[in-house]
């Protein structure tokens, strides 16, 4: 047994300049540190991060967004309870914190407080054993490098532009190694920048490092991406050695009106109504959709473009629409739930029963402990679903999710573009892991979609 000797929390800053929490854990022979990210578009069923609004710390940071209350909870409540535990007893530690909080969504102590301790404990254990985190969590079975979903154009809550869908991503599925996938991404990203600039569009980037131009439709976004893939010397396709496929995170909960049960492309609508330059003659463009109309809209996009994955195509309250689309195209396309299931086995179980999705996005801070995250992945995998480990829009230089993507054999990772250090840090970590694994390293490419018949 190697006891945990010290747990300490502090406030640090995330990639948006907002406070977040950092946890340090020291055992007799090991040390681990973890920083917790936060999201901009969040599911209602996520575990709750604790912020300082309404507390005595409210004025410490802009908008009451400090996390000193969560820091206090770690230092004064969690630490005294967990110090003395064997650092290798991950699940017992996680369960003890869940019990200590006592609420379904961890709103008492804060999911940010609990997750930070959970991850720092795992990293301290790995350090104690003198092995990397992916080896500690995954054992000898952690050898698959994930296919990256690389954000190339930001919209929605992640950018101040006219694009309503939150993320447009590329997937280098024809690559043979993770390093080659990064080389593909590098070429497509910079060719996209050149194409945007050549047509007078902004090449400033959004929260996750993708470009954030004012474009007139989602189709125009996709046309630019297809052109960039071709200009880089690859094929916008779902098959072949040169294939680069496209993925979309629509984040449609942000577009949904609960009363009317309709979806509105709000940013495009505003640009048209205010006659933003270039949008003056778009008055007849459709900006409002019923659930059924949005199902057909996505199916039409799937026919026109090499899209292989769609995340949160509908609101987290619109389960029927998810099921309808999945029943229609789920055999050939990855239909992924984020806000719908929030990395929670309770909601993943419902998604399995209703056949709403065939893939689960995995965000550790949606559920709040490493053990529960592993349970969510196991449940999804047993049901034949794919899983994608994901960052959040408010990130840090912490690279834990890179190790976990390998350790847990998810096969896919979504962690932003190849700009902004908070995003690139994860890719750099994966490049190191691939080199460490040597000849046993595996990059599956298109084969990662084991549950699809890709056409």
UniProtKB/Swiss-Prot annotation:
PROSITE patterns: ENOLASE. Binds a second Mg(2+) ion via substrate during catalysis. It catalyses: (2R)-2-phosphoglycerate = phosphoenolpyruvate + H2O. One of its GO terms (molecular function) is phosphopyruvate hydratase activity. Its EC number is 4.2.1.11. Belongs to the enolase family. NCBIfam families: eno (TIGR01060). This is Enolase. It comes from Mycoplasma mobile (strain ATCC 43663 / 163K / NCTC 11711) (Mesomycoplasma mobile). The gene is eno.
């Amino acid at each position: 047994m190697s006891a945990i000797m010290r747990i300490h929390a502090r406030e640090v800053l995330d990639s948006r300049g907002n406070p977040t929490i950092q946890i340090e854990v020291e055992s007799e022979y090991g040390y681990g540190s973890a920083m917790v990210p936060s999201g901009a578009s969040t599911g209602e069923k996520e575990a709750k991060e604790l912020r300082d609004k309404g507390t005595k710390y409210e004025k410490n940071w802009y908008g009451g967004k400090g996390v000193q209350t969560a820091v206090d909870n770690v230092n004064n409540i969690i630490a005294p309870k967990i110090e003395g535990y064997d650092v290798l007893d991950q699940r017992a530690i996680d369960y003890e914190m869940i019990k200590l909080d006592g609420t379904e969504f961890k709103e008492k102590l804060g999911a940010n407080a609990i997750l930070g301790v959970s991850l720092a404990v795992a990293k301290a254990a790995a350090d104690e054993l003198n092995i990397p985190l992916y080896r500690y969590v995954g054992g000898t079975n952690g050898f698959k490098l994930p296919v990256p979903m690389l954000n190339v154009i930001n919209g929605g809550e992640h950018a101040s532009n006219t694009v309503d869908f939150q993320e447009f991503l590329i997937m280098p599925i024809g690559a043979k190694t993770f390093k080659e996938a990064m080389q593909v991404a590098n070429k497509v990203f910079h060719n996209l920048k050149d194409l945007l600039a050549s047509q007078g569009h902004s090449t400033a980037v959004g929260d996750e490092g993708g470009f954030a131009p004012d474009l007139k439709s989602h189709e125009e976004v996709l046309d630019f991406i297809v052109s960039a893939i071709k200009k880089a010397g690859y094929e916008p396709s779902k098959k072949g050695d040169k294939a680069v496929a496209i993925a979309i995170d629509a984040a449609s909960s942000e577009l949904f009106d609960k009363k009317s049960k309709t979806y509105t492309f709000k940013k495009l609508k505003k640009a048209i109504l205010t006659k933003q330059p270039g949008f003056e003659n778009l008055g007849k463009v459709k900006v409002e959709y019923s659930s059924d109309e949005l199902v057909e809209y996505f199916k039409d996009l799937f026919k026109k473009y090499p899209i292989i994955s769609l995340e949160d195509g509908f609101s987290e309250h619109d389960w029927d629409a998810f099921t309808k689309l999945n029943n229609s195209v789920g055999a050939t396309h990855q239909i992924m739930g984020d806000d719908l299931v929030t990395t929670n086995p309770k909601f993943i179980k419902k998604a399995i029963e209703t056949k709403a999705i065939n893939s689960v996005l995995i965000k550790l801070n949606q559920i709040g402990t490493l053990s529960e995250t592993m349970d969510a992945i196991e449940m999804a995998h047993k049901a034949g679903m794919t899983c994608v480990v994901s960052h959040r829009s408010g990130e840090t230089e912490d690279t834990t999710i890179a190790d976990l993507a390998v350790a847990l054999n998810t096969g896919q990772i979504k962690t932003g573009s190849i700009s902004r250090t908070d995003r690139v840090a994860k890719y750099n970590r994966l490049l190191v892991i691939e080199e460490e694994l040597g000849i046993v390293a595996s990059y599956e490419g298109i084969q990662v979609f084991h549950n699809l018949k890709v056409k």
